[in-house]
Amino acid sequence: MLELDAWLEIAKSAALEGGNYLLQNQGKELKVLMDSGRDIKLQLDTDTEKLIKESLSSQSSFSILGEETGLSNNLGEFYWVVDPLDGTSNFLRDIPISCVSIALMQEVTPILGVIYDFNHDDLYFGHQNSKAFLNQNEITVSDYSKKNQSTLVTGIPAKTHYSDEEFKNMINDFQDWKKVRMIGSAAMAAIYVAAGKAETYKENGIFLWGIAAGAAIVEAAGGVASIKNIQADYRVDAIFTNQHLAN
């Protein structure tokens, strides 16, 4: 039987190591590897992912799927998914909404998640056999049951292009909610749902590494995480919410 508590400690250690490295480089002149359309990549993204992968590999034999460097080897039943810096644009512009995100997957299901909000030294974590926590404090999803009382967090993925009709449908959906937020980090959006700060996160065409850890933590917090339409490049459609709005 998989020892999820032990793997959780490994993921927490790697996330903290990655987050501390990012903090050490915050405010420095950063090398931009790619700036195209709505997407941007830093050398720091790649360097941080390498550090996290080394930490995970030194303590486990699972393969690793990373945003920046792809697969370490063929995927097995269990594998790590890593986003070394979710919210790169925010980080580059000194907007303190970014994080390190690490998930353990069983086939296509996130079973463990760690998200380190290094800007505030907040560590979120949980797995399928545990509660969800912010540092040492348990967190749970909210009890709001109506959209017109609730907050939706969403986004427009950098590599997704919406038709006019799709944009129209999105705006129509926004009108059902009390508040709508776009914060530039899918992982942080998921955490807001897990911690009861928002009721729903949804985004189509988002990459798996941005939402996998959040999915596991939302479910550990008593919520519902739906990941559908997984594509060959690991884009997915994600909806995370509380129990009331899932029905």
Give residue spans per PLM region.
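An extended, acidic
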Residues: 141-247
